[in-house]
C-alpha cells in the first residue's frame, strides 16, 4: 500500500461509493514516540474542523494517514498511504488538508529526515519556557509545568506543533491568536530524564483585564480574570491523575499571583467539569474550611463572599461547591440540617436562575420542573462526590482529562 498506487476511473467507483469512502477519524492514526523509542498510537476524537462535518474522505481505498510526533520536541511527521485512488482532479487531498494546519517544519514521508531533525533539535535541548512553581513528584516520576514564551522562536514553534491537538481532541476547539499577548500557554512535562523530557499535556488561558475601581486604576494595579480555555492531557497519560495535578499546580500558581482575582473556565466538557469540581472541592476542604462547619445560615453572608474571593472562585462554581458540601454532609451524617432544607435551598437557586421561564408555567408544571431539575442535579453531585473523603482530608482524587472549548481554547 502506498501513495503511488494505481488510479481507478470515477465511473467504476460510482457503482460502489462505500468502497472509496473512509472515516477520517479512523483513517487518521496519531503516534507519539516514547523515551525508549517505541511509539504509542491512538485516534482523534474529532476531525470535522479539518475534513468537514461528515468526517469522511472520499476517493481512496484503504486510506491510512500517519501523524507522528516526538515525545520531547513534538517535531511533526506526516505520511499518507492508500491502495488505490480515483482518477478525479476534484478529490480532496488529505495531505494538503493536514499540512495547512501543521507548522512549516512538518516533514512529509521522509522518516530518515524526520529522525535526523529530531536528533539535531535534542542536542543541548532546553524546554522553551519558564518553570511555573517547583518540580514535583507523582509516583516514581518528576514533573514540571512551563509557561511558553511566544516571543521566543522555539516557544512559538512548540505552540504551532501542539495546537493541532486542539482540533482533534476538543469539541468546537479552534486555534488561538498567538500574537495576542493576553494568551498564556502552559506545557506540562515529565522531567525524570532532564535531557529528554516528555510532553504530558498543555493548557491555554486568557487574561481578561478587570476594572478594580479608580484608586487601583490610578495606582496602576492590574487585576485580571484568568480564563482557562483549552486543557489537554495526552491520551496515554489520562487516567493517571496527572490532569488533576496539572490543574492544581496551575491554580496554586494563580493563587499566589496578586493580579489574578478570579479563575474561570470557558465552556468545559463534562469530564473537565468533573476534574475541576473534585480538585476545587478537595482544595477547599483540605486547606480552607472544615466540611462540618458549612451551614445554611452562613452561605449567603459576608463569610461566604469573602471565602469565594479569597479562593478566586467564580460565583456559579462557588455555589455548586457549597451545594455539593451540603449533600456530602447529609451522606456522611455531618450536619443537623435536614434533607428537605437542603433541597429547598438548592431549588431556590434553580428557580432564580430560570425565573423568567418558570414564571410562565402553571404552578404544578413549575414545581414538577424544579423537582426534576433538583433530582438530576443531586444525582450528579453524588456521582462527583463518589470516592472523595473530604472530611478526612483525603489526598487528591482526580483524573486526567481534556476540556472542550468554543472559539478560542
Swiss-Prot record:
Catalytic activity entry: L-lysyl-[protein] + acetyl-CoA = N(6)-acetyl-L-lysyl-[protein] + CoA + H(+)
Gene Ontology biological process terms from the UniProt entry: double-strand break repair; subtelomeric heterochromatin formation
One term of GO molecular function: histone binding
SUPFAM superfamilies: Acyl-CoA N-acyltransferases (Nat)
Enzyme class: transferase
Highest taxon above the source species: Eukaryota
Binding site for acetyl-CoA: 231-233, 238-244
Principal place of residence: cytoplasm
Keywords associated with the record: Acyltransferase, Chromatin regulator, Cytoplasm, DNA damage, DNA repair, Nucleus, Transferase
Region (Interaction with histone H4 N-terminus) location: 53-55, 206-208
Gene Ontology cellular component annotations, sorted alphabetically: chromosome, telomeric region; cytoplasm; histone acetyltransferase complex; nucleus
Residue(s) at site: Interaction with histone H4 N-terminus: 183
Residues annotated as catalytic: 266 (proton donor/acceptor)
Enzyme Commission number: 2.3.1.48
Keyword Transferase: yes
Annotated Gene3D superfamilies: 1.10.10.390, 3.40.630.30, Histone acetyl transferase 1 (HAT1), N-terminal domain
Function: Catalytic component of the histone acetylase B (HAT-B) complex. Acetylates 'Lys-12' of histone H4 which is required for telomeric silencing. Has intrinsic substrate specificity that modifies lysine in recognition sequence GXGKXG. Involved in DNA double-strand break repair.
Subunit composition and interactions: Component of the HAT-B complex composed of at least HAT1 and HAT2. The HAT-B complex binds to histone H4 tail.
The family this protein is said to belong to: Belongs to the HAT1 family.
Protein name, UniProt field: Histone acetyltransferase type B catalytic subunit
Amino acid at each position: 500500500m502506498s501513495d503511488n498506487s494505481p488510479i481507478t476511473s470515477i465511473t467504476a467507483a460510482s457503482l460502489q461509493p462505500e468502497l472509496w469512502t473512509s472515516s477520517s477519524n479512523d483513517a487518521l492514526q496519531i503516534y507519539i514516540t516514547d523515551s525508549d523509542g517505541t511509539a504509542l498510537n491512538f485516534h482523534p476524537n474529532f476531525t470535522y474542523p479539518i475534513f468537514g462535518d461528515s468526517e469522511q474522505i472520499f476517493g481512496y481505498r484503504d486510506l491510512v494517514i500517519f501523524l507522528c510526533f516526538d515525545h520531547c520536541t513534538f517535531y511533526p511527521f506526516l505520511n499518507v498511504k492508500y491502495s488505490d485512488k480515483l482518477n478525479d482532479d476534484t478529490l480532496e487531498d488529505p495531505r494538503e488538508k493536514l499540512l495547512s494546519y501543521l507548522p512549516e517544519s512538518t516533514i512529509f514521508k521522509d522518516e530518515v529526515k524526520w529522525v535526523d531533525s529530531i536528533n539535531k533539535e535534542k542536542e543541548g535541548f532546553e524546554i522553551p519556557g519558564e518553570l511555573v512553581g517547583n518540580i514535583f513528584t507523582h509516583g516514581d516520576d518528576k514533573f514540571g509545568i512551563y509557561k511558553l514564551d511566544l516571543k521566543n522562536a522555539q516557544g512559538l514553534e512548540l505552540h504551532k506543533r501542539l495546537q493541532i491537538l486542539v482540533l482533534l481532541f476538543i469539541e468546537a476547539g479552534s486555534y488561538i491568536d498567538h500574537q495576542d499577548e493576553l494568551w498564556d500557554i502552559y506545557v506540562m512535562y515529565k522531567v525524570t530524564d532532564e535531557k529528554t523530557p516528555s510532553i504530558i499535556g498543555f493548557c491555554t488561558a486568557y487574561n481578561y483585564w478587570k476594572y478594580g475601581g479608580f484608586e487601583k486604576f490610578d495606582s496602576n494595579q492590574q487585576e485580571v480574570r484568568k480564563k482557562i480555555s483549552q486543557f489537554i492531557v495526552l491520551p496515554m497519560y489520562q487516567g493517571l491523575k496527572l490532569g488533576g495535578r496539572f490543574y492544581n499546580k496551575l491554580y496554586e500558581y494563580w493563587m499566589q499571583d496578586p493580579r489574578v482575582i478570579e479563575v474561570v473556565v470557558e465552556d468545559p466538557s463534562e469530564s473537565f467539569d468533573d476534574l475541576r469540581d473534585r480538585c476545587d472541592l478537595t482544595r477547599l476542604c483540605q486547606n480552607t474550611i472544615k466540611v462540618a462547619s458549612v451551614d445554611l445560615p452562613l452561605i449567603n453572608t459576608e463569610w461566604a463572599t469573602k471565602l469565594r474571593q479569597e479562593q478566586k472562585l467564580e460565583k456559579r462554581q462557588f455555589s455548586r461547591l457549597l451545594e455539593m458540601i451540603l449533600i456530602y454532609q447529609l451522606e456522611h451524617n455531618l450536619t443537623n440540617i435536614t434533607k428537605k432544607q437542603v433541597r429547598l435551598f438548592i431549588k431556590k437557586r434553580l428557580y432564580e436562575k430560570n425565573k423568567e421561564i418558570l414564571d410562565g408555567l402553571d404552578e404544578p408544571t413549575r414545581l414538577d420542573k424544579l423537582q426534576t431539575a433538583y433530582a438530576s442535579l443531586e444525582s450528579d453531585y453524588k456521582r462527583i462526590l463518589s470516592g472523595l473523603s473530604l472530611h478526612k482530608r483525603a489526598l487528591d482524587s482526580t483524573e486526567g482529562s481534556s476540556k472542550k472549548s468554543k472559539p478560542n481554547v
